[in-house]
Every structure is written in C-alpha cells, then in structure tokens.
C-alpha cells in the first residue's frame, strides 16, 4: 500500500485553527499548539456563558421590576404575588419592558396587583 502523506490535510487543519485564533495576543494567535489550546478554552467559555446570559438577563429584569414597583409602594415579591392572585400572566421580560418604557401601563398593573393581594391573616401572630 502507498504511504499517505498528510501535508495538505495538516496544513488546512492548522490554517483553520490559526484563522479562528485571530485577535488573540502573542503566541496564542501565531503558534498552532498554543492557538489550539486557547480555542478549546474559548469555546468552553462561550458555551458556558451562553447559558449564563439567560440568568443574567433574568436578574436584570427582576431588578428593574423591583425598582419600578417600589416607586409605587410595593416590593417585587408582593407585586408578583398580587399579579399571580389577579391571574395576570405577564413574564418578567415584558414587565421590565413596561417598567422602563410605559410607566402608565406598569402603574395600572401595580394597582391591579395591590387590589388582588390578600390581607395578612391575624391567626399567625
């Protein structure tokens, strides 16, 4: 059997890795082994952070809703409790959007939530 020389395949593989590593500092963009290792780490971080981004946005939405509802005299927890009791199913993303861009609509939701919150029971004392 003839011997297979991997010249073209190896060069292509290295060229792809080095082109993906453009923009890295120092040896990580010029040397194949360092670039390959950095690419593996970069892809791991990218995968992890794509998952983490969803939680970061949820935290941001909750902060915005909390700030806006406190301006109307209600904490985030009580506001969400009131919305659930009133049967209003608006997700946090839309609530945060309303809080930032449409204060009148958000104020109406807060008033609805205030009316729907059950009175605290006296038997707990």
From Swiss-Prot:
Superkingdom as given in the UniProt entry: Bacteria
Pfam family name, one: Ribosomal_L20
GO biological process, one term: translation
InterPro entries: Ribosomal_bL20, RIBOSOMAL_L20_CS, Ribosomal_protein_bL20_C
GO molecular function, a single term: structural constituent of ribosome
Record key words, sorted: Ribonucleoprotein, Ribosomal protein, RNA-binding, rRNA-binding
GO cellular component: ribonucleoprotein complex; ribosome
Assigned protein family: Belongs to the bacterial ribosomal protein bL20 family.
Function description: Binds directly to 23S ribosomal RNA and is necessary for the in vitro assembly process of the 50S ribosomal subunit. It is not involved in the protein synthesizing functions of that subunit.
HAMAP family linked: Ribosomal_bL20
Protein name: Large ribosomal subunit protein bL20
Organism expressing this protein natively: Thermobifida fusca (strain YX)
Name of encoding gene: rplT
């Amino acid at each position: 059997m003839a011997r297979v020389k991997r010249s073209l395949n190896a060069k292509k593989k290295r060229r792809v890795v080095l082109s993906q590593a453009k923009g890295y500092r120092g040896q990580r963009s010029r040397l194949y082994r360092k670039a390959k290792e950095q690419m593996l780490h970069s892809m791991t971080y990218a995968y992890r952070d794509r998952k983490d981004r969803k939680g970061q946005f949820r935290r941001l939405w909750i902060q915005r809703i909390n700030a806006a509802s406190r301006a109307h005299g209600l904490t985030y927890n009580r506001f969400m409790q009131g919305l659930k009791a009133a049967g209003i199913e608006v997700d946090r993303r839309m609530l945060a959007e309303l809080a930032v861009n449409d204060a009148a609509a958000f104020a109406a939701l807060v008033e609805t939530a205030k009316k729907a919150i059950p009175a605290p029971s006296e038997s707990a004392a």
